[in-house]
Amino acid sequence: MKIHEEILKRRYVIKGILNEGSRPVELAPPENNSSHPLSYMELPFDPEYTLYNNRMTPEFLNNVSPDEQYWAVRQGVILRNTGEFPVEISGPEAEKFANVIFTRDMSKFKLGRCSYQFACLHNGGMITDGVMLHLKKGLLWMAQADGELFKWYEAHAKGFDVNVKDPKVWVSQIQGPKSMHV
């Protein structure tokens, strides 16, 4: 059996190990493999992390069975810290610029609303998807799924009066039928 076939049979995770002292060199700079600010809330469940958008997100909780997780979200409430990567698009031509990147017409996208969006190549191939927030005129946040989209923004921003940046925020989800009580 070839070595790459053996590698494909394995699941690779990042395990949290108590560290006393300075940050390990392998994890520097801190922008790489960064963890959600609320990750400490996951520690009692002995999480195993995977990289998603160059951010650590829990893939498996060793102290909670998959059945317990399923029923918690179906009958109760859960807080899930996700790896979606928010990108801020701002400026007088933010909506016009978004029409070049995404498939849905921004003129139909009301202020204060969210919209499921697809970023596509010129030939129609999908790059990634995510949830767009229309915060105010000239200000959009795209919480994108895993995939490299930032360079695509930069490549298409020329000629538009827009600013594309990482707003340095994280996404969390509160899910389940009892979520409105939290």
Predicted regions and their residues:
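Acidic, low-complexity central loop/insert segments
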Residues: 131-182
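Short amphipathic alpha-helical segments, especially helix-boundary/capping motifs
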Residues: 71-75, 127-130, 156-159
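Long, hydrophobic/aromatic-enriched structural stretches that serve as scaffold segments
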Residues: 123-128, 135
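Acidic, proline/glycine-enriched N-terminal capping motif
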Residues: 2-120, 125
